Structures are given as structure tokens and as C-alpha cells.
């Protein structure tokens, strides 16, 4: 059903028999038009799901993207989260409005809930909608009493019975499974999929013919220290001024339309938690046969990029043998001290390319923006509680890899531009609208950063970041700038990437963890190595595929965000009634305070007093909600000077 409804955004030649009543006499009749023998959703109509936040319902489109999720009006109260509905969208400056037209599918048969006692009865409270009426279960009260307090369960709504027990809400080790279940992420692979992965994992590089032997080139991978899936490797030949970028050739192990392919596409992306990963592909491939492990011959797609003439980049099917799997910290130590156990050829490659990468970055930032995201990395103990929080900062090693990957991705986009007339799988990023820009100007004004008259948006971003560095508030200003941006999206047509400053861009370098890259590999391989016979077929599915990927990208981000919010709420529970130094980040309906001691933990405070962003305050944590992942508190002291 969902696949058929998504296809209506792009046009279908024939309506399947089982869906004909919906179109001929049913709820879709007024929303569809016939255009050149194709049935297509009319302009202004949209199909999507419901996402509830507190007492409001928001519309999540199956295929379209809005700057903000539309607010649903006139929605009947009976509709559950994830029901599929037809809406008419009215765009406005602040937030689009979705007017409910009809229900297409209200068959949400399962729900995640937690057990609680209300009026001397144990009932199930919907996790995503804790404000709604509790659900009475068919189980006896005696049997429910045997379960842990606040037990988290999956409920079969038709039978009103528990179908799965996830565990006690108070147990931190439940958090991964809970976040995955809340957003319907499939955790396990089918037996067919695992068996097929195991079969392909046993194949050796020597089993594949007609590939260029690059095993003499000393490639290196550079990744986070806990990485196990190595997608990409680099080597810089200083004499030829040529960069080699090798990317795992995953498509050789994942046949199109196989169970492996279908299950990878359903997931779309690997989901990463601090201590684990839920991969897009089975471990025998993602951490085994496809991963570019040191001293193992591996299949790769290899770019040879002459840095004197980037347009002459050449893509080949090759066999490589990586010399070292290194962590960012290890490479940074070498770049700073010139001391390393790496071979001389690798040392020269890294030092030589660092010089080039810094120049490339400097040139790139004349048109693109350096989004300093200040990512917080959580370290968890064996009990699943936060042990340590580190802020990951930019480094020479990050610059090496980032610039190399950007070159490979741009080279791939050029192939799409030149051979498919700007069609394919692109990674795009729209410039913020005038309304979004104005909101950012207003927020930065509160931070005492004023936009000079007649200064354009892009120069102002650089100006704001420069002032923020002088004021030592770069983290806060970067956060505001990032929040003001549109999401980067996948598109079947070439559009520019505002953030990077590129006219054309795509994702090529992470096929182990992103289905977009795997699909792009198939398209480019068909073009370059298989007489382009299947290109038109692969191109035909890109509109629907890109829409799927955008939805799955959002889902993966929500899962990871939900997990982190709950971990911070657990941390706050350990410090109830304790006081901390913080800084005001926002001051609207709630005052939002970031804690200096626990970077990333935000405390919501309801107060009648007026506060300004960047005010230094002392707060007391009063409440932590594991359901909503919220921490609340009160301000106990106002400190006059700004945070340094």
C-alpha cells in the first residue's frame, strides 16, 4: 500500500486492481489527475503519516520535503501515529498547514507502550502519545503485576495483548531496542538474507575477473577509533600529483532485487549508537567481505583524480590491499609530531596530501560554508549509562579524509551531469528561504551579532562565525546557523548544494552504510563497464528511491536523537536537586539552558522572568522524564557576565 501511494507522486501508468476502488469512487478521486497516460497526485495534495508531539499533530510526507513539517488541522482524534492520510497543503511563511481530507490506512496494528498503575488498574500508556487515553489490556491484573514496574511492551492493538516485552523503563540497557522499536526499525535480518550474505562473504577477490590490480598501492583508511566497517581508503602520489580514492565495491556482493538488496533498501542507512551499530547489511558483509581491512585483498571502485585537472578523474573496477586501518587520533599524532610506525610511503602520502587538502579547503570555503557542528561523543559504561562526554573537533586527519571524499563525490556527480543530462541520485541542499534567513538574523541579534547593511546571507554567515570566535561563543552560534539550514536531501535531478558551495554533488563513498551510495555505484558501473544497457531502468526508479531515502534518512536521525535524549535524561536522574552552572541558549516559551559540566544536556525551565541568550545562570535539576527524554529545572541564580 505505502509503495503504491508513494508512486503516485511520480506517476503510475496503471492502477493495480486492489487499489482501483480508492481511485474510481474513493478518497483519492479528487486528488489524482491523468497526465499523458499516467496517474499523478495533483498539486497541493500530499500523502503522509502523522507524527504527534505533545497535543499537536504534524504531517510527515511520504515523498515531499517542507522547511517545517506541516501542522495538521481538523484531524479526527481516533487516528493513531503512523496512519496514512491524504491532506491538502496550504503553505504559509511560518509553517505549512495540512488540512485533513481522508484516511487511506489507519491500520496501525502494533504500538510501543509502558505499563503504569491508574485507578488501581495496570494499563498500557502509549509511548509516543502519553497524554492520550490509556489502553486496557486483556491480560489479568495478576499476570501484569508479575512484570517489572514501568515495563515497556509492544502491544497488538487488535487483540489488546502484549506481543513483545522490551524490558523495564528504568533499565538503561533497554534504550537501543526502545529507540529502534519506537521508529519501526527492523533489527534482524531474515534467514534468506543472512544465508545469501554468508555465501557472498566466502568469495575471494581473485574470483572476480577483469579488474585492475591496485594491490601495489599503499592505501590507508582513517576512521573513528571504534569503527569496524571501512568504506573508503586513500593514497596520494606526490610525483604524479594524483589522489587515489578506493571505495568498497559493495554492489558485487548485493545483487539487485535479491533479499540482501531488498532488506538493505528497507533500512536505507546503518544506525549508530555509542557502543553498537545496527547495519544496513549483515555483519558478514559490512564488517567482513566488503570492509577494507588491512592486508586483505578487497574489491573496490577506484578513482584516480589528477589534482591538476579534476575533470579528468577516472573510475575503475579494481582490487586493492589496504596497508593500515588507522584512527583519526593516530594520524593527528603523526601530523603533529612526524612520528609514526607507518611506512615511509604512507607518511609521505599523508603529509603531501595534507598540504593539498588545506589548499582545497581554503578554496572551497570561498563558496561553501564550514559548518562547525561540535559533535558530542558519548561514552557509555557496561550498565548503559553515560560515563564521559567528549566534543569531537576538526583536525588535520578529518580534513584529509573530508577533502578526499568530497573530490570523489564531485567526480561522481560530474559523471551524472555529463552522461545522464543532470539525472541520477544527487545530494542537494537548498539555500534557506528569506523567512529562514530573517529568523536567523533575529536570533543572532540576541547574541549581539548584527548584520551589516546590504551584506548578503553567505558573507554574513562567515561574518557571524568570525565574531563568535572573538566572543568565544562559536559553539552556540554554529548551533543556531545549523538549525537555520534546510536539510540536505537526495534528488533525482541535479540541484546545487548550498552548504558546500557545489553546483553538483552526490554520495559515492559510503556504500556499506548508505543505500544511496550503493544505488549510485550500480548506475555508474552500468554506464562505464556494461554498455549502459540498464541505465534507463535504473534512472526510472530514482525519483521514488530518492523519496524513500529522504524519509529513511530522517528516521535514522530520529532514532539516534531519541536514544541520546533518553541517555541525557537518565544522567539527569542521577543529579536531581543538584545545582549546575549553565548558559541560556533560547528564551521563548521555555528557557533552554545548556550545562557547562555535561555538554549536550539541555534543561527546560518555565519562568515568568525575562532572560537573554548567553546569560550565565545557576540551575537546579528538578525533573527528568524518560518517556519524552526531557530534563526540567529551575534557575536559582542569575550571574551577570556572559559565559567565556
Curated annotation (Swiss-Prot):
Keywords: Cytoplasm, Exonuclease, Hydrolase, Nuclease, RNA-binding
Domain RNB: 211-529
SUPFAM superfamilies attached to this UniProt entry: Nucleic acid-binding proteins (SSF50249)
GO CC annotation, single: cytosol
GO molecular function: exoribonuclease II activity; RNA binding
InterPro entries, sorted: NA-bd_OB-fold, RNase_II/R, RNase_II/R_CS, RNase_R, RNR_OB1_N, RNR_Ribonuclease
EC number in record: 3.1.13.1
Signal peptide interval: none
HAMAP family xref list: RNase_R
Protein's UniProt name: Ribonuclease R
Organism: Helicobacter pylori (strain J99 / ATCC 700824)
Organism ancestry: Bacteria, Pseudomonadati, Campylobacterota, Epsilonproteobacteria, Campylobacterales
Protein's gene: rnr
Amino acid at each position: 500500500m505505502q509503495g503504491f501511494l508513494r508512486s503516485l507522486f511520480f506517476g503510475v501508468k496503471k492502477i493495480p486492481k486492489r487499489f482501483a476502488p480508492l481511485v474510481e469512487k474513493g478518497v483519492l478521486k479528487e486528488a489524482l489527475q491523468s497526465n499523458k497516460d499516467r496517474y499523478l497526485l495533483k498539486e497541493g495534495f500530499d500523502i503522509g503519516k502523522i507524527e504527534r508531539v505533545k497535543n499537536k499533530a504534524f504531517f510527515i510526507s511520504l515523498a515531499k520535503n517542507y522547511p517545517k513539517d506541516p501542522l495538521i488541522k481538523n484531524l479526527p482524534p481516533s487516528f493513531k501515529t503512523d496512519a496514512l492520510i491524504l491532506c491538502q497543503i496550504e503553505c504559509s511563511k511560518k509553517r505549512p498547514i495540512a488540512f485533513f481530507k481522508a484516511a487511506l490506512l489507519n491500520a496501525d496494528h502494533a504500538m510501543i507502550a509502558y505499563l503504569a498503575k491508574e485507578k488501581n488498574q495496570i494499563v498500557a500508556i502509549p509511548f509516543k502519545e502519553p497524554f492520550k487515553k490509556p489502553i486496557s489490556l486483556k491480560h489479568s491484573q495478576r499476570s501484569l503485576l508479575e512484570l517489572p514496574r514501568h515495563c515497556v511492551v509492544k502491544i497488538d492493538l487488535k487483540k489488546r495483548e502484549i506481543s513483545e516485552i522490551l524490558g523495564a523503563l528504568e533499565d538503561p540497557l533497554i534504550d537501543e531496542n526502545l529507540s529502534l522499536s519506537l521508529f519501526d526499525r527492523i533489527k534482524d535480518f531474515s534467514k534468506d538474507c543472512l544465508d545469501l550474505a554468508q555465501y557472498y562473504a566466502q568469495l575471494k577477490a581473485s574470483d572476480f575477473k577483469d579488474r585492475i590490480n591496485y594491490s601495489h598501492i599503499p592505501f590507508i583508511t582513517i576512521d573513528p577509533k571504534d569503527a569496524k566497517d571501512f568504506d573508503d581508503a586513500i593514497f596520494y602520489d606526490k610525483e604524479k600529483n594524483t589522489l587515489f580514492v578506493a571505495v568498497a565495491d559493495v554492489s558485487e556482493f548485493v545483487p539487485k532485487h535479491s533479499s540482501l538488496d531488498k532488506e538493505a533498501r528497507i533500512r536505507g542507512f546503518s544506525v549508530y549508537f555509542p557502543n553498537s551499530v545496527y547495519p544496513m547489511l549483515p555483519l558478514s558483509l559490512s564488517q567482513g567481505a566488503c570492509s577494507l581491512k588491512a592486508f586483505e585483498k578487497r574489491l573496490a571502485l577506484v578513482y584516480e583524480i589528477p589534482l591538476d585537472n579534476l575533470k579528468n578523474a577516472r573510475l575503475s573496477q579494481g582490487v586493492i590491499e589496504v596497508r593500515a586501518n588507522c584512527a583519526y587520533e593516530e594520524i593527528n599524532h603523526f601530523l603533529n609530531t612526524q612520528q609514526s610506525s607507518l611506512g615511509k610511503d604512507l607518511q609521505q602520502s599523508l603529509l603531501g596530501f595534507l598540504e593539498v587538502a588545506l589548499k582545497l579547503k581554503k578554496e572551497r570555503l570561498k563558496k561553501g560554508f564550514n559548518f562547525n557542528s561540535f559533535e558530542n561523543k558519548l561514552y557509555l559504561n557496561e550498565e548503559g549509562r553515560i560515563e564521559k562526554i567528549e566534543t569531537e573537533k576538526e583536525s588535520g586527519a578529518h580534513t584529509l579524509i573530508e577533502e578526499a571524499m568530497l573530490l570523489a563525490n564531485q567526480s561522481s556527480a560530474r559523471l551524472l551531469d555529463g552522461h545522464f543530462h543532470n539525472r541520477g541520485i544527487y545530494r542537494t541542499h537548498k539555500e534557506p528561504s528569506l523567512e529562514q534567513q530573517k529568523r536567523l538574523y533575529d536570533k543572532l541579534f540576541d547574541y549581539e551579532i548584527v548584520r551589516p547593511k546590504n551584506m548578503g546571507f553567505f558573507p554574513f554567515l562567515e561574518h557571524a562565525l568570525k565574531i563568535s570566535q572573538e566572543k568565544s561563543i562559536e559553539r552556540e552560534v554554529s548551533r543556531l546557523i545549523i538549525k537555520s539550514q534546510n536539510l540536505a536531501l537526495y534528488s533525482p535531478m541535479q540541484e546545487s548544494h548550498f552548504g558546500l558551495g557545489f553546483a553538483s554533488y552526490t554520495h559515492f563513498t559510503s556504500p556499506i552504510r548508505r543505500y544511496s551510495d550503493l544505488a549510485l555505484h550500480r548506475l555508474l558501473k552500468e554506464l562505464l563497464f556494461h554498455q549502459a544497457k540498464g541505465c534507463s531502468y535504473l534512472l526510472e526508479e530514482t525519483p521514488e528511491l530518492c523519496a524513500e531515502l529522504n524519509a529513511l534518512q530522517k528516521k535514522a536521525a530520529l532514532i539516534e536523537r531519541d536514544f541520546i535524549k533518553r541517555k541525557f535524561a537518565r544522567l539527569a536522574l542521577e543529579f536531581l536537586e543538584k545545582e549546575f552552572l549553565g548558559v541560556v541558549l533560547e528564551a521563548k516559551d521555555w528557557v533552554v539552558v545548556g550545562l557547562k559540566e555535561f555538554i549536550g544536556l539541555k534543561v527546560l525551565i518555565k519562568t515568568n522572568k525575562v532572560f537573554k541568550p548567553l546569560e550565565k545562570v545557576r540551575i537546579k535539576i528538578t525533573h527528568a522524564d524518560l518517556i519524552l527524554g526531557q530534563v526540567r529545572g529551575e534557575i536559582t541564580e542569575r550571574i551577570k557576565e556572559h559565559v567565556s
